[in-house]
């Protein structure tokens, strides 16, 4: 029922959209449904979500970059493949890596924070690629602030949110 609802909603979006978590899981084995989107879109899978959508990732980073670039172009979306490094690819073939490692971000809810940051940037008029790049960087910086304050083991996604102001106040970061 949820899978059908997600698939049925895709062509009705009128503003740029982010698909994460259960929206991606609803497309399991049906990535061609992404082509029904009529607006710019960002998908933000981690490795397991990627596997359900597209199949397993290669092991070598250069092969990961290649396949992410290929899928972004094929399905006309911006992809933020979460991991270390996070691989961001546009539908036009541009690929970027954000390499900050922080095990404190590998927790449930952290991807929701990332999606929220990216969505806020999209709402301000940034392109999907700009929002994905800047949002991923802001998320990593806020995660680093939280890690320094609390340690990676004890930090929570809410601590990343609390650290956003530190990132924005430090003008040299932006």
Task: State each model region's role.
Residues 1-100, 173:
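Glycine-rich phosphate/dinucleotide-binding loop and adjoining beta-alpha-beta core of small-molecule
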Residues 143-174:
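Charged C-terminal helix
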Residues 54, 96, 107, 128-132:
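Extended hydrophobic-aromatic, low-complexity segments
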Residues 118-123, 139-140:
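Interfacial segments of multi-pass membrane proteins
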């Amino acid at each position: 029922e949820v899978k059908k609802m997600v698939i049925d909603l895709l062509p009705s979006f009128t503003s740029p959209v982010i698909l994460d978590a259960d929206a991606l899981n609803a497309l399991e084995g049906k990535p061609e449904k992404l082509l029904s989107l009529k607006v710019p879109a960002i998908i933000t899978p981690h490795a397991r979500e990627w596997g359900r959508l597209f199949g397993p990732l290669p092991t070598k980073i250069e092969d990961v970059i290649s396949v992410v670039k290929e899928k972004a172009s094929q399905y006309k979306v911006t992809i933020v493949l979460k991991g270390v490094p996070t691989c961001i690819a546009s539908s036009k073939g541009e690929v970027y890596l954000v390499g900050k490692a922080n095990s404190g971000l590998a927790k449930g809810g952290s991807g929701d924070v990332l999606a929220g940051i990216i969505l806020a940037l999209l709402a301000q008029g940034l392109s999907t690629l700009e929002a994905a790049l800047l949002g991923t960087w802001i998320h990593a910086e806020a995660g680093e602030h939280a890690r320094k304050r609390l340690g990676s083991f004890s930090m929570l996604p809410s601590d990343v949110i609390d650290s956003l102001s530190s990132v924005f106040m430090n003008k040299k970061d932006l």
